[in-house]
């Protein structure tokens, strides 16, 4: 019995660690595409941009993290001054929570896809952020 209680306690500890680096946060979602702004061909670090990549503030969302939207997952590989200073959230947010939201700039392969997605989804949404620690623990 004592061993069972110890095993259950140990499992609970592992489960808590598994979810320790998963968080949900309110984000202002913007879009960019090839040829628009700095998204010509590569991210700031030389990574070739593809669909399912996004730009984030690395101080708030580490590079390599997965940002989970209601319809897709993106990997944080890029950054930019408007993302870091949260210009889109500060100018469009009506409530304090919206003005303080992180900005996630989602990359699309074409302008048409980006604008279609932006028109059919809200400007602010709750996204889940999975850091690499969560991914490694899950494998």
Residue ranges and their predicted role:
Residues 19-139:
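Solvent-exposed, well-ordered loop and adjacent helix/strand elements within mature globular domains
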Residues 7-15:
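Bacterial N-terminal signal peptides
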């Amino acid at each position: 019995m004592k061993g069972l209680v110890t095993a259950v306690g140990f499992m609970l500890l592992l489960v808590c660690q598994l979810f320790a680096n998963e968080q949900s946060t309110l984000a202002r979602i913007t879009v960019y595409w090839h040829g628009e702004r700095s998204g010509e061909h590569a991210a700031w670090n030389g990574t070739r941009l593809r669909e399912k990549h996004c730009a984030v503030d690395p101080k708030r969302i580490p590079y390599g993290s997965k940002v989970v939207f209601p319809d897709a997952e993106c990997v944080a590989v890029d950054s930019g001054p408007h993302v870091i200073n949260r210009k889109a959230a500060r100018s469009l947010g009506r409530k304090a929570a919206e003005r303080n939201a992180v900005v996630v700039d989602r990359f699309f392969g074409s302008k048409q896809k980006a604008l279609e997605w932006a028109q059919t989804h809200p400007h602010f949404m709750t996204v889940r952020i999975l850091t690499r620690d969560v991914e490694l623990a899950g494998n």
